[in-house]
C-alpha cells in the first residue's frame, strides 16, 4: 500500500494536468463505472500510476477521500466522503445509474466522465474527482461501480437508498408526509407505515436503518429525538408529520400516541398548580413569558376542534305541559315563560362552551344559573315587552326552587336535558369509530368524571327530588361519554389486528377448530335461539373474517345483524325488551366461543378477546340507538331510564313482566328472541324441559 502524502517519490501519486483556471473546492458526488469484464473470484487489478510531474502552483490539489467498490450487477451506490475539485448544485437530487457516467479500462489510458446529474459547469480536464483512500490505498479496478462522495459529514445524503427505492415509494412519502416545525413522529410507526406500503404494492422493503437514510434524503433537515416518559421513551423524527388528508391517519397502530405527538410542542398544556389570589401581583411579571394553563388548553382545543362536530344544530325544546296542575301562589305563568327563555339560553351557552372544548367553564356556568341572587325588590325576573328581541336574564334561586317543585316543570326540564346532553354527545363524538387524539379522549373522560360533582355543588339547597332528577340525567350523559370513549379506544386497538394478515389467518384457523355444534347445544337451553339463525351468523362471521374486512366493513356487518334479528319486532311494544334479550344472548354465545378457544389454548385468543370486547360494545351502541328510534326518545333518555339502580322501581319491571306474560300465552311458539325457556316453564308448568 502506498501513502498519498509521500510527495514526489511516491509511485502512487496522481499527476494532474494544469487547468485553465483554478476551481474552488466543493463537496460533490461523482459516479464512475468500470466496464471491465473481470470475472468474480479473479484478484483485482491494481492500477500503477506514474510518478508525479511538476504541477503549476495555481492548480488546486485533490484531497484523499474514500472510494468504495460495489458489484456491477447491483444498482447500489454506497456512501463515502471526498473533497472534489469542482462545484456542484447543492439542491437535493435523486441519482441513478446512467450510461453517460462510465469509466472504461482501455490499453491507451483512462477517461473519466462526471455523472449525468452533475452540472455542466464542471471543468473538462480528464482527472476530475479521481481520489484515493485516506490511508493511501491504490485505486482498485474491475467490473463494478465506484461512487466518490462529498467530503463533509454534514453534507452526506443517501443516494444508494434513493436510487434503490421505487418511484411509487418516493411518491408515497411525498403524498403522505410533510415537514413542519415543532412536530414529531415515532420512528417505529413511520417504518411500520412503510412496511404496509410495501406489502400492498408487492415491494421488497429495506431495513429500518436504510429506510431512515431514505427519509433523510427526501425530507431534508430532519432530526432525531428521544421523546416520552422515563422508561417508555421512543425515538422520533423531529420536523415531520402526516398530512391531514393522508389515509394513514385512519391506519395508526398507535393512533392516540401519534396524534398527541403531532401537536406542536408550544400547544401542549402544562398543568401547573393554580396560583393563589394573593400572589397574582407577583406573577404578573411572568405573564408575558409563560402562557397560563387556560391559554394552553384553549390552544389545544383549537387543534382538537377538527375531530368534533361544531356544525351541530341545537333542536328546539318542547313546551311544558302543565295540564290542570295548580301552580303555587308564588309561581305564575309569567314565571313559567321566563323559565323557558332563560333555560333555553342556559342550554345554548352550555353547548357553545362544549363546542369550544372549554370544559372548565361548565361548573361556573351552572353555579351562575342555579345560584342567582334576586335582581329586584320582589325577586321577580323581568321579561321583555316583545318576544322578538328577548332579554337575557336569570331567575333568582328561590324562584327556581318554587318552579322545580312543580312536577310538570321538573319533567319538562328533564326532557330538555335529554335533548341538550344528546346534542353534546353528538358534538363531542360524532363517529365512535373514527380515530381521535388520546389527549381529546382523556379530556372528555375527565369532563365526564366531574359532571355529577359540579351539578350537585351548584344545586346545593334545592329539594332532594329535584337534585336526583337532574343528577340522574347528567349521570346518563357521563356514562355515555365514558362508554363511547372506551368504544373508540377499542376500535383503534382492534384496527391494527384486523389489518394484520397473519393474525387474521391464525384467527380463522383457530375458529375453524371450535366445536360450534357443542356451543349451540349448551346455549340453546338458555337462549332458545333458532339453530338456522345461529348457523347463518357463524357462516357470515367466518366469511367476513376470511375476506380480511376492514373495521368499517365489520361495523356494517354488525348493523345488518341487528336489523335482521330485530326486524320481526319492529313497531311492537316489546321491541325494547327484545333488543335487551338479544344483547344478553349475543353476549352468552360469544362467551361460549371464547371459552372453547381458551380450553384449546388458541394462539389467537388475545386477538379474539379484543375483537369480542369491541363487538359487544358496538352491539350495545347499535341496540341503544335502535331502541331510541323505536320509542321516539334520545339514546340519553333510553339509558337514563335505568341508570340509577338505587331508585329503580321494581314495580315497573313487574308490570312489564306481567304484560309479556299475557302475550306469551298467545305466542308460545318459541321465536328466536321471545321469552326464555325458564320463564315459559314458570308460566306453563306442563311445558316439557328441553336440553336436559
From Swiss-Prot:
Q: Name the residue ranges with Basic and acidic residues bias.
A: 660-685
CC terms in the record's Gene Ontology section: cytoplasm; nucleus
Which Pfam families did the record assign? BCD_RFX, RFX1_trans_act, RFX_DNA_binding
Chain spans, region Disordered: 1-26, 261-296, 660-692
Give me the positions annotated for DNA binding.
169-244
PROSITE patterns (UniProt xref): RFX_DBD
Q: Which UniProt keywords apply?
A: Cilium biogenesis/degradation, Cytoplasm, Differentiation, DNA-binding, Nucleus, Phosphoprotein, Spermatogenesis, Transcription, Transcription regulation
Residue list for modification Phosphoserine:
26, 386
State the Gene Ontology BP annotations.
acrosome assembly; cellular response to leukemia inhibitory factor; cilium assembly; positive regulation of transcription by RNA polymerase II; regulation of transcription by RNA polymerase II; spermatid development
Which InterPro entries does this one have? DNA-bd_RFX, RFX-like, RFX1_trans_act, WH-like_DNA-bd_sf, WH_DNA-bd_sf
Q: Where is the composition biased (Polar residues)?
A: 285-294
Tissue specificity of this protein = Expressed at highest level in testis. Expressed at lower level in thymus. Also expressed in stomach, kidney, liver, brain and heart. Weakly expressed in spleen and lung. Within testis, most abundantly present in spermatocytes: present from pachytene spermatocytes to early spermatids (at protein level). Also present in non-germinal tissues.
| Compartments, as annotated in UniProt | Nucleus; Cytoplasm
GO molecular function list: DNA-binding transcription activator activity, RNA polymerase II-specific; DNA-binding transcription factor activity; DNA-binding transcription factor activity, RNA polymerase II-specific; RNA polymerase II cis-regulatory region sequence-specific DNA binding; RNA polymerase II transcription regulatory region sequence-specific DNA binding; sequence-specific double-stranded DNA binding
Tell me which family the UniProt entry assigns to this protein. Answer: Belongs to the RFX family.
Oligomer status and interactors: Homodimer; probably only forms homodimers in testis. Heterodimer; heterodimerizes with RFX1 and RFX3.
Q: PANTHER family per the record?
A: DNA-BINDING PROTEIN RFX2, RFX TRANSCRIPTION FACTOR FAMILY
Function recorded in the entry: Transcription factor that acts as a key regulator of spermatogenesis. Acts by regulating expression of genes required for the haploid phase during spermiogenesis, such as genes required for cilium assembly and function. Recognizes and binds the X-box, a regulatory motif with DNA sequence 5'-GTNRCC(0-3N)RGYAAC-3' present on promoters. Probably activates transcription of the testis-specific histone gene H1-6.
Name recorded for this polypeptide: DNA-binding protein RFX2
Amino acid at each position: 500500500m502506498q501513502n498519498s502524502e509521500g510527495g514526489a517519490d511516491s509511485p502512487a501519486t496522481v499527476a494532474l494536468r494544469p487547468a485553465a483556471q483554478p476551481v474552488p473546492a466543493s463537496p460533490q458526488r461523482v459516479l464512475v463505472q468500470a466496464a471491465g469484464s473481470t470475472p468474480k473470484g479473479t484478484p483485482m487489478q491494481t492500477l500503477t500510476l506514474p510518478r508525479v510531474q511538476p504541477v503549476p502552483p495555481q492548480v488546486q490539489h485533490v484531497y484523499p477521500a474514500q472510494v468504495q467498490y460495489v458489484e456491477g450487477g447491483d444498482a447500489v451506490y454506497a456512501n463515502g466522503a471526498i473533497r472534489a475539485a469542482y462545484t456542484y448544485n447543492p439542491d437535493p437530487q435523486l441519482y441513478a445509474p446512467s450510461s453517460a457516467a462510465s469509466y472504461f479500462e482501455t490499453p491507451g489510458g483512462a477517461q473519466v466522465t462526471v455523472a449525468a446529474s452533475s452540472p455542466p459547469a464542471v471543468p473538462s480536464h480528464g482527472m476530475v474527482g479521481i481520489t484515493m483512500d485516506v490511508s493511501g490505498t491504490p485505486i482498485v479496478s474491475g467490473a463494478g461501480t465506484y461512487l466518490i462522495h462529498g467530503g463533509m459529514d454534514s453534507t452526506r445524503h443517501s443516494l444508494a437508498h434513493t436510487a434503490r427505492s421505487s418511484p411509487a415509494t418516493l411518491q408515497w412519502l411525498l403524498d403522505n408526509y410533510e415537514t413542519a416545525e415543532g412536530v414529531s413522529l415515532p420512528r417505529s410507526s413511520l417504518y411500520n407505515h412503510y412496511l404496509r406500503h410495501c406489502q400492498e404494492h408487492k415491494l421488497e422493503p429495506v431495513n429500518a436503518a436504510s429506510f431512515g437514510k431514505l427519509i433523510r434524503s427526501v425530507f431534508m433537515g430532519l432530526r432525531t429525538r428521544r421523546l416520552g416518559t422515563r422508561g417508555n421513551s421512543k425515538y422520533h423524527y423531529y420536523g415531520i408529520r402526516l398530512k391531514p388528508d393522508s389515509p394513514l391517519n385512519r391506519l395508526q397502530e398507535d393512533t392516540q400516541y401519534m396524534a398527541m405527538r403531532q401537536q406542536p410542542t408550544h400547544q401542549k398544556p402544562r398543568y401547573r398548580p393554580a396560583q393563589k389570589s394573593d400572589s397574582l401581583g407577583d406573577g404578573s411579571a411572568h405573564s408575558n413569558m409563560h402562557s397560563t394553563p387556560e391559554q394552553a388548553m384553549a390552544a389545544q382545543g383549537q387543534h382538537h376542534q377538527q375531530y368534533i362536530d361544531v356544525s351541530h344544530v341545537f333542536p328546539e325544546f318542547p313546551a311544558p305541559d302543565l295540564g290542570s296542575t295548580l301552580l303555587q301562589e308564588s309561581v305564575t305563568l309569567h314565571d313559567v315563560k321566563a323559565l323557558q327563555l332563560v333555560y333555553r339560553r342556559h342550554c345554548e351557552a352550555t353547548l357553545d362552551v362544549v363546542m369550544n372544548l372549554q370544559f372548565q367553564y361548565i361548573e361556573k356556568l351552572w353555579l351562575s344559573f342555579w345560584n342567582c341572587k334576586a335582581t329586584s325588590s320582589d325577586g321577580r325576573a323581568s321579561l321583555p315587552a316583545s318576544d322578538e328581541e328577548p332579554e337575557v336574564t336569570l331567575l333568582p334561586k328561590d324562584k327556581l326552587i318554587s318552579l322545580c317543585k312543580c312536577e310538570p316543570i321538573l319533567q319538562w326540564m328533564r326532557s330538555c336535558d335529554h335533548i341538550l346532553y344528546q346534542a353534546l354527545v353528538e358534538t363531542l363524538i360524532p363517529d365512535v369509530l373514527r380515530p381521535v387524539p388520546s389527549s381529546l379522549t382523556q379530556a372528555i373522560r375527565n369532563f365526564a368524571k366531574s359532571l355529577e360533582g359540579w351539578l350537585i355543588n351548584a344545586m346545593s339547597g334545592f329539594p332532594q327530588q329535584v337534585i336526583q332528577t337532574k343528577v340522574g340525567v347528567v349521570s346518563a350523559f357521563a356514562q355515555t361519554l365514558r362508554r363511547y370513549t372506551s368504544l373508540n379506544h377499542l376500535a383503534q386497538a382492534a384496527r391494527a389486528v384486523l389489518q394484520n394478515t397473519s393474525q387474521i389467518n391464525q384467527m380463522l384457523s383457530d375458529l375453524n377448530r371450535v366445536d360450534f355444534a357443542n356451543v349451540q347445544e349448551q346455549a340453546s337451553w338458555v337462549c332458545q335461539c333458532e339453530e338456522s339463525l345461529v348457523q347463518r351468523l357463524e357462516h357470515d362471521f367466518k366469511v367476513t373474517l376470511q375476506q380480511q374486512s376492514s373495521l368499517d366493513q365489520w361495523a356494517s356487518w354488525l348493523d345488518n345483524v341487528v336489523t335482521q334479528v330485530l326486524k320481526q319486532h319492529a313497531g311492537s311494544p316489546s321491541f325494547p325488551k327484545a333488543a335487551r334479550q338479544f344483547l344478553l344472548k349475543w353476549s352468552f354465545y360469544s362467551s361460549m366461543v371464547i371459552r372453547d378457544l381458551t380450553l384449546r389454548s388458541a394462539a389467537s385468543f388475545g386477538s379474539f378477546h379484543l375483537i369480542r370486547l369491541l363487538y359487544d360494545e358496538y352491539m350495545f351502541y347499535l341496540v341503544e340507538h335502535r331502541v331510541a328510534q323505536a320509542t321516539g326518545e334520545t339514546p340519553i333518555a333510553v339509558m337514563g331510564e335505568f341508570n340509577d339502580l338505587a331508585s329503580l322501581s321494581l314495580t315497573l319491571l313487574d308490570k312489564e313482566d306481567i304484560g309479556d306474560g299475557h302475550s306469551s300465552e298467545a305466542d308460545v311458539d318459541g321465536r328466536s328472541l321471545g321469552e326464555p325457556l325458564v320463564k315459559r316453564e314458570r308460566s306453563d308448568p306442563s311445558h316439557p324441559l328441553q336440553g336436559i
